[in-house]
Amino acid sequence: MKPFAISNALACALALCVVFAGAGHVDASPAMPVMQDSDDADQSKLLEMFVHYVLIAKPELAEANGKALLDSGITDAELATLVDESKFQDRFDRAISRGWNMSDGVSELARTIHSRVEQGRHDLARNPDRITESIKMLVGTLRQKMFGEQRLLAAGEYAMPQLLKQIVDGTDPQLEAEVTKVIEQIKRQAVIPLCVALPDVDAGTQRKICDMLGQIGWPTAAPFLLELAQNSETPENVKLAAMRAYRRVGGQSDNVASQFTALARRYFNQQQSLIPYPGDADNNFWRYDHFAGLQGTPVPTNIFCQVMAMTMARDALVHEPSDATALSLYVAADLRRENQMKAGQSDPIFGDNKQYSPQFFATASGVATCQDVLSMAIE
């Protein structure tokens, strides 16, 4: 743990921070010819043949077709589409798994193909145009609906701006019903995007969001739901929906500030379940705008939890300025954020205040706050 030097001799230390056929499988079909890489090469057939020869343990032929596939100029997105929208996805998974244990050539190809398929899935899932197309598919044929749902679930929170827009617009009841189901299936990744929109959407949409949050049942929503329920300007039917959802997510206290403080503490402790994509370089900080709708700002993942902790602590202080725990969490998260930020990184939410450093704010907050921060560091 790295100590934080604070003026006036106060030292605040902060704890910083595919797949294989069953054994013994015998393919009695005649050997398939090896396709050569050419302008006429059928990439789908090359992939199918690679899978086929891996599963029947023909490494030379598998390697030839795998190389031809990769040399054909196929993109990661095209490769992912071939796998995910084909009828042999299960066989692909088994072939990749078996291929890892075959000869060096096949093993390397299997790993490369698998890596590129995963990257392609990642790229496709978050593509805004593909998300738009996938939403339209929700009211198409049964097959289109299935593919649309799969794509949107893969997109996760990145689909939320367009999904929420359908709820806010409310112009197509059938599509809205399908979108609601998808949002509820996205589960925890949908919670913060929904919560930040709560104060700024119309009453009808507020009630719908409350119902979705209650159905998802993720406790992160608790302070936002209680805040809405206790707002004097909230219509009575929305208050009832908010309180109903609040109970469903496990809310018990009637103190909004304490709820935000508790969430700030969870972020400060860097609970992995609060990070939508722990393996990504960035995670989104969500805001809602009346005109632009839901917008995400990428924040470096290594400081994401501290940025969120500061945000939740600040919200707690809005409701209860004398909340000493919230103030201490804000100061501690600010110090840890500075410590965890890597060279060349910046914080697009709280910025890089060169005039007033985190140490300055820690000192200005007083001895008691610094002592609380020190206690957090050594816990």
Feature map (PLM): residue ranges:
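TPR/TPR-like alpha-solenoid helical repeat scaffolds
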Residues: 77-99, 237-251, 258, 325-355, ...
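Short, charge-rich amphipathic alpha-helical segments embedded
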Residues: 63-92, 157-169, 288-294, 314-344
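TPR-adjacent "capping" and linker segments in tetratricopeptide-repeat scaffold/adaptor proteins
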Residues: 31-45, 118-129, 133-137, 250-259, ...
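Structural detector for internal amphipathic alpha-helices that build alpha-solenoid repeat scaffolds
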Residues: 48-55, 64-69, 81-85, 107-125, ...
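Bacterial N-terminal signal peptides
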Residues: 8-22
